[in-house]
Amino acid sequence: MADRSLSLAACTGLIAVVVIGVTVLVAPHFMFPPDGISMFWPTNGIVLGLLLIMPSGIRSRAAFALPPAYVVAELLIGHPVETLVGFTIANSVEILLALWLFSRFGIIDNPLSRLRNLMLVLITVSLCSVLGGLLGALTIATLSEFQSVI
């Protein structure tokens, strides 16, 4: 049991470090002022890939590290609270929805084994990316002092 909790702690820590590191160091280079909207957000793709290669018993519990890690990352970037809350929700929903759809389609443990699975992966991540971006943009438009995105 101790070995399992250690691996859960290691996976959760890895998720938090990657989210904070990539978001703070790489992602701001793709943001457009003044809203902080980004056309390319590498953090979510990297984290989704990490979650997919984790053991299935740990994957869902390690995903609980996403919201706190995004809050810390957004604070380090310097976003206001309204933006921080909206981006945290949008990014977390995007990844959790993709994981749920992968498990619903039955492709979470071996997503690239067949052409059908590959197409489901591409459709799922495209859909989740669009929904996450839309949710983030709507948050900025409604909560931020800058309402230039809509």
Predicted regions and their residues:
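Short helix-perturbing small/polar motifs within transmembrane alpha-helices
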Residues: M1-M39, G45-S148
